[in-house]
Curated annotation (Swiss-Prot):
Native organism taxonomy: Bacteria, Pseudomonadati, Chlamydiota, Chlamydiia, Chlamydiales
Chain positions recorded as (S)-2,3,4,5-tetrahydrodipicolinate binding sites: H138, G147, T148
Positions that bind NAD(+): G9, D10, T11, G12, R13, M14, G78, T79, T80, C104, A105, N106, T107
Keyword annotations of the record: Amino-acid biosynthesis, Cytoplasm, Diaminopimelate biosynthesis, Lysine biosynthesis, NAD, NADP, Oxidoreductase
Full protein name: 4-hydroxy-tetrahydrodipicolinate reductase
Pfam families hit by this protein: DapB_C, DapB_N
Length: 246
């Protein structure tokens, strides 16, 4: 049976791309969506769809989770920029007790590969190397340091802690720029006295993000993800294992 997919933020950049992509999918169909200007309520979108995909705003995501906790549905959260006191993380954790919850700051394969390489490099370069993360996005993006950049920093810190068997206190320099209509650029640099090692990922089209969402949807619908909290890395990790070691 075809699954109904509800888009929250269906008139935004990602929402429009996903709408176009979902119209061509054989195993699902586009259900009622929600935007700030839509006549459909958020509660309707939750109750009348099988799976929710959210690319909206932190405020709307928080409200969406309130409804999902009453009527649990599998959900993919692509919204970023949550504050620590917003309560969203607590709601996501609670919802994951009932259904699969996939939280993804960046759904592109390239972003996953960059993170893997950055973590690997962090294990090899000593703490004498300075680490810098630069990110650039379009001027309308709300969060000043992107979720992807934060995720990169977390991966580097985790790798160094594992490598040196204790939690280090390295300073990771982070910079964010908001320029024009840039889809997304992330650069990680390891800088020593005599060399600089750079890992750079640049997105030319948001289609790469919608393609990642479709892969996650296929995993939810095809394999029947069990309830739990996931990131897009989980999907790409299985792909990585298959391609490299399979």
């Amino acid at each position: 049976m075809k699954k109904s997919i509800g888009l929250v933020g269906d008139t935004g950049r990602m929402g429009v791309l996903l709408t176009q992509a979902l119209l061509c999918r054989p195993h699902c169909f586009l259900g009622k969506g929600f935007s700030r200007r839509s006549q459909t309520s958020l509660e309707e979108v939750v109750t009348e769809n099988d799976i929710l995909v959210d690319f909206s705003s932190p405020e709307v995501t928080s409200l969406l989770l309130d409804f999902l906790l009453k009527t649990p549905r599998p959900v993919i959260i692509g919204t970023t920029g949550f504050t620590n006191d917003s309560g969203v993380k607590t709601k996501l954790s609670a919802l994951s007790e009932y259904v699969p919850v996939v939280v993804c700051a960046n759904t592109s394969l390239g972003a996953y590969v960059q993170k893997r390489l950055a973590a690997f490099a962090a294990k090899l370069f000593s703490t004498s190397y300075d680490v810098r993360i630069l990110e650039t996005h379009h001027r309308a993006k709300a969060d000043a340091i992107s979720g992807t950049a934060i995720s990169l920093a977390e991966a580097i810190r985790s790798a160094k802690a594992e490598s040196y068997e204790e939690e280090p206190e390295p300073f990771i320099e982070m910079h964010g720029s908001r320029l024009g209509n840039v889809c997304g650029e992330h650069e990680v640099s390891f800088v020593g006295e005599d060399e600089r090692f750079v890992i750079r990922h640049e997105v030319f089209s948001r289609r790469v993000f919608s393609g990642g969402v479709l892969l996650i949807l296929e995993k939810i619908m095809g394999e029947g993800l069990p309830k739990g909290y996931y990131t897009s890395d989980v999907l790409y990790e299985s792909l990585f294992q298959e391609k490299v070691f399979g």
